[in-house]
Swiss-Prot record:
Belongs to the aconitase/IPM isomerase family. LeuC type 1 subfamily. [4Fe-4S] cluster binds at C349, C409, C412. Pfam families: Aconitase. Its EC number is 4.2.1.33. This is 3-isopropylmalate dehydratase large subunit. Coiled coil: none annotated. Binds 1 [4Fe-4S] cluster per subunit. It comes from the Bacteria. One of its GO terms (molecular function) is metal ion binding. It comes from Cereibacter sphaeroides (strain KD131 / KCTC 12085). Gene3D superfamilies: Aconitase, domain 3. The gene is leuC. Keywords: 4Fe-4S, Amino-acid biosynthesis, Branched-chain amino acid biosynthesis, Iron, Iron-sulfur, Leucine biosynthesis, Lyase, Metal-binding.
Amino acid sequence: MTAPRTLYDKIWDDHVVHQSEDGTCLLYIDRHLVHEVTSPQAFEGLRMTGRKVRAPEKTIAVPDHNVPTTEGRDTKIDNEESRIQVEALDKNARDFGINYYPVSDIRQGIVHIVGPEQGWTLPGMTVVCGDSHTATHGAFGALAHGIGTSEVEHVLATQTLIQKKSKNMKVEITGSLRPGVTAKDITLSVIGLTGTAGGTGYVIEYCGQAIRELSMEGRMTVCNMAIEGGARAGLIAPDEKTFAYVMGRPHAPKGAAWEAALAYWKTLFTDEGAQFDKVVTIRGEDIAPVVTWGTSPEDVLPITATVPAPEDFTGGKVEAARRSLEYMGLTPGQKLTDIKIDTVFIGSCTNGRIEDLRAAAEILKGKKVAPGMRAMVVPGSGLVRAQAEEEGLAQIFIDAGFEWRLAGCSMCLAMNPDQLSPGERCASTSNRNFEGRQGRNGRTHLVSPGMAAAAAITGHLTDVRDLMTAPAEPA
């Protein structure tokens, strides 16, 4: 009888092609997602060595990082480097015969939104991409993580990857979340507790009642930021919600293949008695709407808190806090709700899905953004955009004073025209608040979609619960 195994153990074991004496393994890769920034050198490497893509049917490409989110982008991209990278992906996709969603295709969008949306991401798979937020796909019970450009070439050529196994970490969120608290608050709160190095060397399995109660889109948000917590990947065991989400998607199994897949997927859970190397437990009811105040995702506090002082920290974090406060232009003791906001960005692979847009629109309905506020919504894919327009969400955003954009990574990172100006302060639903992440000397506060919408209305960081519609009193 085999020893109890974790979900990570099971997926890993199912994909080991060969294991060396030192523990290094050759892993088979089921899905390879590709975008325009980390792939050009990899494809050129194939050309130079006369190789083909080993499994073009398992390789999916989409431009997202560099593409503008304004009309006319399918005919002209002004930035030369961005244009060259997008054109290179277009040519490489044609030359090597891989699946491709060009800018002109309504299915185009952020690669980590397109993959699940199209049914490419399935439970039990290994999924890689030259992008750190590949962990998103772990929401399906897939082992998904980012790889470097040389590894991109290796996977293109061999459909395998050389890896050493990580350790197992469990993050359990018990109980239920309170109203106004979201998946984004969960993942930021975990990072705030463990730090950005807390998951280093581990693959995290997220579990507990609060995780089970999340939708698939919420689970993707949680797993998306596993990398910000230092982990190699994040996983959530698949369940009936997972199967319902996947069923009927363009590239999901059909007929007898679906039944066979479903039988396998139902074995993908951590066995009773399986051992984790590290365990973190948080009570769901203790999580509040949160916001980052500094320049690291671990600099996170409940919106009801005040800006900390360097003296509140120890060791090397004292100087780090001092630098963060200086860069962010904040004063210790200042209420987080007193911090003025210039710009609001709703989008990214963390929070650019239809449920994220619904949550923001619910807060914005019938309201206007604060005077002078720059606010934009960037759907995560063309299909999300179309659905939001069909549901009337787009009109709510437009009526409130938001810009309604085309799909792309947009202001999550300063690699396209959507950027902050020096000193500009943004409430953002993205995943990183590093110095210059959204533009040189730009200041980023990470929040949930509802919190971003609240800040857009009031002009400052705001507790979304103060703007939520109170439930009707029972008769």
